Each structure stands twice: as C-alpha cells, then as structure tokens.
C-alpha cells in the first residue's frame, strides 16, 4: 500500500496476484481480514529471508576482500542460518493461513485509522526488547538454542485521504500482550503515535 511493503525481488505479476487482498486500498474501509494479515506476514518474512541471504553473501565477500577472519564470518553465518530457518517456518505458516484463513490466526494488538495522510509508509517486523514499563519482551542475551526471538508486524499505510496504523502478532506469539495493553492505556492518540514513531525509528 503506497510502497510500504515494496519488495523488488518479487516479480510484479506474482506480487499482484499473491498479495492482491492486502494491497488493495479499498479493503481498508474496515479492519483487515485474517487473509490480509497473512499476506502481510508472508511478505514480511520474504523480506527477512532475502535480507539474511544477502547478509550471508556479504560475510563471504568481507572474508575474501578485506580479510575478515573466517571464524568470525562463519559465526555470523551460523546465526543467520538460525534466523533463516525461523523466517522460513514463519513464511510457511503465513502462506497456509493465507490459503485457509481461520478466525484467531492473528491478533491485532493496535489499530488506528487516521483522518489524514501520514508522510511515511512502513511495513515490516520488529522485535521489541522491552515493553513500556521496562519488562523484557525479547531477551537478546539468551543463549538457549531453543529460545526464539518473537517479532510483531508494524504497518503504516498512507491511503488516499486516510492512514492505517496497525500492529499485529501471530496467534502463537503471546509476548506482546502487556505491551499492547500499555500502549492502548496511554492518555491520547498523539501519545500512542509518538510511541509508535519512536519504535519505528529506533528499530
């Protein structure tokens, strides 16, 4: 929507077919459907997969061209492989939900429709470290291989005369519950948008 999730490695024909529901501005007259959320989730994970693949190639180039130690390069690639597997699994789940959406597949933790067009468009995943009260959401120092970093999806969609601001998570992600409650308890819309703006430019 307005270039928010433009992913130039996907062919235009595929993009228009696979993601046609969520990329149609007319579908934002109401709260987005589960199918639309699944399509957003799919594209977010495709972007994450592409980023990790490019980073792996970059580490090889750094080793070959500027003499970065092989141990360091391999360690970075090993971490990337873990992320890649998680993003691929998340993409597969999102694709399944897009084809057969069920109520409750996703939870919209925050939604606002603004009566004006915001000057920025964004679509992607963010892994918050703390909530608004300093409680840990994602422990980035946890060394347990079974521990997973959990993302939320943030969408800022400027439309023709309005804007959609939305954050949502998969049904199996319960780490953001307190954060969403804290955000909605803030005094007014401007405070909520200020927090979202801070998150956008901090992560």
List where the protein language model places each region.
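Alpha-helical structural context detector biased toward long hydrophobic helices
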Residues: 1-203
